[in-house]
């Protein structure tokens, strides 16, 4: 990022300075979209409510606060309990902060003035949250635009702004959500700089993990190392999601690492490791998966499966450009996986027939990737008019859109040997006819391989943000402690 002038978020040392002008530009983009919408009347005002601090169940133990994502996108405010309003006609923005009691200074530190927040976030105006009713009344809005809509990844409804006195205003809660979501789909240059930074630090952390892993370690030791590196070197207090540190058969558990399986297995000689981890900086995510042999050397079978996934990953990235339909990229990955599994002897028969039978969904039951930004599964995958395709494999896609410049996505093909899916396939004559059971048996307990990259769609191709060893030779050299430079994949830009 160019030298930052004006107010910025910065955690010192070598961390990234992020100008708060990033959020002013986001508010400007939102107003421009809304003004073009014929349903938006003159005098409309956007009202967003930030996140609130929460406690651990019935205790007084605070859960570490992280800002609500839409509010962060628009204002970049790190404090809880705030509101923000934006005059659509003028673009003028007002931040509302809590009026804190004097006792706050004893327990939590200095109570800052409204002028402090105005300067910190480069706002047009700052008022207290208990004044929002009177301030909005004085502005005489024709309508308040509040945020209500469904997140297509979680199925949850985002929280709509509410405050004492809102009932006396005319409120529209249908216009704002699709417009602000579409703004979030396309990243500005300043946003891309932050995502390059999150990828830089997280990539370095993955390389440190690959150098440190040893047979006999606990999976959580590597989780700890990753998070320590991201925080100590990158200022990343939060991870983008719960770390997945799967070894052996755990590497076939797609969302391993949860409370019931907390990265607690002892890594064994001969295991494949699948580590899916990403640090978060100033609410901007990264999402990177590396797969490698625990002992630093690929077996023939591990190499065959790994290089099958690497081939599909690079084929997809090489094909990405504006206008490409994302479901076609999933079909491309499936075909390559089936070709390679046939080459290893696990499958036999016509690859075209395998594709028709949707056999690829047996070895890759998840989608191919997702939008990435302020949320790891970022919004905008299925706007109105984009329908989910009800076919095995394709129904798991987190988006079915055509690619456009400025979109940031993950590319994460994988091949997994999941017992219950294999058993179902072998019990289905339409699938069983393709399997060589004797060869397949050799891969039972193998686990899985996933390669996950973060990329931005450019005017003519894509830019790879992630920088980790990917070829078999690069991985083995890294795990042996070699600091020899490697060349990241570069498709058309």
UniProtKB/Swiss-Prot annotation:
Its cofactor is Mn(2+). Mn(2+) 1 binds at residues 276, 287, 452. The modification Phosphoserine is found at residue 167. Its EC number is 3.4.13.9. It comes from the Eukaryota. It is an enzyme of class 3 (hydrolase). Belongs to the peptidase M24B family. Eukaryotic-type prolidase subfamily. Homodimer. One of its GO terms (biological process) is proteolysis. The keyword Ligase does not apply. Keywords: Acetylation, Collagen degradation, Dipeptidase, Hydrolase, Manganese, Metal-binding, Metalloprotease, Phosphoprotein, Protease. The modification N-acetylalanine is found at residue 2. Pfam families: AMP_N, Peptidase_M24. GO terms for molecular function: manganese ion binding; metalloaminopeptidase activity; proline dipeptidase activity. It catalyses: Xaa-L-Pro dipeptide + H2O = an L-alpha-amino acid + L-proline. The gene is PEPD. Mn(2+) 2 binds at residues 287, 370, 412, 452. SMART domains: AMP_N. Binds 2 manganese ions per subunit. This is Xaa-Pro dipeptidase. Gene3D superfamilies: Creatinase/methionine aminopeptidase superfamily, Creatinase/prolidase N-terminal domain. Dipeptidase that catalyzes the hydrolysis of dipeptides with a prolyl (Xaa-Pro) or hydroxyprolyl residue in the C-terminal position. The preferred dipeptide substrate is Gly-Pro, but other Xaa-Pro dipeptides, such as Ala-Pro, Met-Pro, Phe-Pro, Val-Pro and Leu-Pro, can be cleaved. Plays an important role in collagen metabolism because the high level of iminoacids in collagen. A dipeptide binds at residues 255, 287, 377, 398. It comes from Pongo abelii (Sumatran orangutan).
